Amino acid sequence: MLARPDVFPGARAAACLTQFKRQSPLIHCLTNEVVQELTANVLLALGASPAMVVEPTEAAQFSRLADALLINIGTLNASRAESMLAAIEAANAAGTPWTLDPVAVGGLAYRTAFAQSLLGEKPAAIRGNASEIMALSGLQASGRGVDSADDSLAALPAARELARNSGAVVAVTGVVDYITDGQRDWAVAGGDVLMTRVVGTGCALSAVVAAFCSLPGDRLDNVATACRVMSHCGEMATRRAAGPGSFTPAFLDALYQLRPEDLQ
């Protein structure tokens, strides 16, 4: 039986969030068209600055200026792939950390091949559900589009292997999130099923992961903090919301009101 990793300590999350609020990073988000507004609002609520620059020549230029880059392949096409490759090349040249969200990898051939081709481009972090992480690592998965039929703990060995092979911190998210650098693991519980009834919460989490990758220090802790921030605020929002329609504003309010001591 696969042993469950230790729970990520609240004190470490609080310290990371304190540092994040001091830094207020600029995040270049090449994300999918469905989730841009929620992604931008989540980053703004946390105190970060989002930008979505998609023209290939500008994407490269802006990635050199940003503190972190997000690559989300949810609405991938040839033009967007060109922008992503240009942004990644520029980010790597500038030493800017970039995060991959491999949306629906494993179910569709074009995006699967594209995402796998990016693994050699030194991502700082990879965030996906169990099916996406298993497929990206080369294992059989049972996802359907952006949904996962696999358990996050069952995907942890694949996440570890993916982390070792890519050099990235890998977050496999679900009812419990597991974060690994291939050698060390953290578990982050929390959140609520209501988060799965609103489009874009997972994609927004990937943007928050990218933002926390801009911080110095232990990247494993930084990515785990991103997961803890989102799960905690999801819980807080659910207490105030009557359903999906009222969840989103409550979630943004919870992110805006979040204090480091709330994560203790």
UniProtKB/Swiss-Prot annotation:
ATP binds at R127, T173. It catalyses: 5-(2-hydroxyethyl)-4-methylthiazole + ATP = 4-methyl-5-(2-phosphooxyethyl)-thiazole + ADP + H(+). CDD domains: THZ_kinase. NCBIfam families: PRK09355.1, thiM. The keyword ATP-binding applies. Keywords: ATP-binding, Kinase, Magnesium, Metal-binding, Nucleotide-binding, Thiamine biosynthesis, Transferase. Belongs to the Thz kinase family. One of its GO terms (biological process) is thiamine biosynthetic process. This is Hydroxyethylthiazole kinase. Catalyzes the phosphorylation of the hydroxyl group of 4-methyl-5-beta-hydroxyethylthiazole (THZ). The keyword Lipid biosynthesis does not apply. The gene is thiM.
